[in-house]
A protein has these predicted regions:
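Extracytoplasmic
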Residues: 16-50, 71, 237-242
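Conserved MFS/SLC helix-loop-helix module at the cytosolic interface between two early adjacent transmembrane helices
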Residues: 66-104
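Helix-to-loop junctions at the C-terminal end of transmembrane segments
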Residues: 68-79, 270-281, 366-367
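Paired small-residue
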Residues: 90, 94-97, 105-114, 308-316
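Helix-loop-helix hairpin linking two adjacent transmembrane segments in secondary transporters
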Residues: 106, 135-137, 143-191
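C-terminal transmembrane helical hairpin of 12-TM major facilitator-type secondary transporters
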Residues: 283-328
Length: 409
């Protein structure tokens, strides 16, 4: 008899599945972020201003929030693969529309479809890890997916900007559309041998429940709140890091970019830290990561007084933040197979809401009181998440122990 969290999975490391999900998130993240360096060329092509074209970034983010609750439940009711295919199809169509757009309204339509697709694909990708990846590999695979966000920032955006500058901005979107086609082919191939085609239907479960029922699943409210605390603290701090570093060091954007790249290198190590967390225990690792982040955010504004200390601090911040994101997404995806898609939609919603609030609320604080005060507030918010992680570990740590015992058996 299979339990709620232990549907049949592949016993070996799912290379193709991990590649498909990682590439898909990489493409979604790259397309979301690549607009920024392409804005001047887009404004020239469509005979508009940069601030108007910048609305396409906001539109993408809004449609992500719409896509998650609108399309992710398809994975709970029918199958994850179907939801992935719908998301990828919308992504390809939207990206092709952007590449071929002859006017501003058509370009905005393409961006809206691409954002809707990302809202469906990303939470479903997290849910698929819980469905299809053996417990001993989940942290590693989730680490790969999480690191793809960092790879999108470090490689995807500069590559897209280089292609746009060397050839034409349209080629950037054509290449992302090709990546989408490649991911769709991998998902179709994986779906052929999937034993988990219908989410819960084969085990005689009732049809997928409501979002309210998903929110009532044990552990979910606690770890969604931790996600919000972590992401609010992170984005509140990260949004003004570059500006602060430019004030402290001479060299402008170049020097600030190099320091931020150190953070990106640390963030990209999530595949290794996730693998270590698989062995050490996910909830226990989360408590440690949140504790380190709480201290680090409070101290980071003072780190520029020592260059080696700043580099080490940024590297540790990247490692701990990527580990936290990996652990939270893994823990939440493992809360319930029956409601997994909706739970990950809540995870996506909490993350995106934190992005908006963190940067918006900390802006006036930074201008009036400085970066050190921003660090204290973000550390306090993260500390709230740490307290909740301790509570979650004491309340639900038997789940980790149960899964480890099952794995050994």
């Amino acid at each position: 008899m299979k339990t709620d969290n232990m549907i049949e999975t592949k016993r070996h490391f799912p290379i193709l599945l991990a590649l498909a999900l990682t590439l898909g998130v990489f493409a979604a993240g790259s397309e979301e972020l690549v607009i920024s360096p392409l804005l001047p060329d887009l404004a020239q092509t469509f005979h508009s201003s940069i601030d108007v074209l910048a609305l396409s970034i906001s539109m993408y983010g809004i449609m992500i929030l719409v896509g998650a609750p609108l399309l992710v439940p398809i994975g709970d009711k029918y199958s994850r693969e179907l939801c992935l295919m719908i998301g990828l199809s919308l992504f390809i169509i939207g990206t092709v529309i952007c590449a071929a757009a002859q006017d501003l309204y058509t370009f905005f339509l393409g961006r809206a479809l691409s954002g809707l697709a990302a809202g469906a694909f990303v939470p479903t990708a997290y849910a698929v890890v819980g469905d299809r990846v053996p417990y001993q590999y989940r942290g590693k695979v989730m680490g790969l997916i999480v690191s793809s966000w960092s790879l999108a920032l470090i490689f995807g955006v500069p590559l897209g900007a280089f292609i746009g500058g060397s050839l034409n901005w349209r080629w950037t979107f054509w290449i992302f559309a090709f990546i989408g086609l490649l991911v769709l082919a991998l998902v179709l191939y994986e779906a052929r041998g999937s034993a988990s085609g219908k989410a819960g239907q084969e085990n005689g479960e009732q049809p997928a429940g409501t979002f309210l029922q998903a929110l009532r699943v044990p552990r979910v409210p606690v770890y969604i709140t931790i996600t919000f605390c972590n992401m609010t603290g992170f984005y509140g701090m990260y949004s003004y890091l570059g500006t602060y570093l430019q004030q402290v060091f001479s060299g402008g954007n170049t020097v600030a970019g190099l320091f931020i790249m150190i953070y990106g290198i640390g963030f990209s190590m999530s595949v290794f830290s996730g693998k270590a967390a698989d062995r050490f225990g996910k909830m226990r690792s989360l408590v440690i990561a949140m504790a380190v982040l709480s201290i680090l955010l409070a101290c980071l504004p003072y780190a520029p007084k020592s260059l080696p200390l700043l580099c080490i601090g940024l590297l540790i911040w990247g490692v701990m933040q990527s580990l936290t994101v990996t652990l939270l997404s893994t823990i939440l995806s493992d809360c319930s197979h029956h409601h997994r898609g909706k739970i990950m939609a809540f995870y996506s919603l909490a993350s995106n809401l934190a992005v908006t609030l963190g940067s918006a609320v900390m802006g006036p604080v930074y201008i009036r009181y400085g970066y050190s005060f921003v660090g204290l507030i973000c550390a306090a918010i993260t500390l709230c998440g740490f307290v909740l992680s301790v509570y979650g570990y004491k309340q639900y740590s038997t789940h980790d122990q149960h899964m480890e015992e099952t794995l050994h058996q």
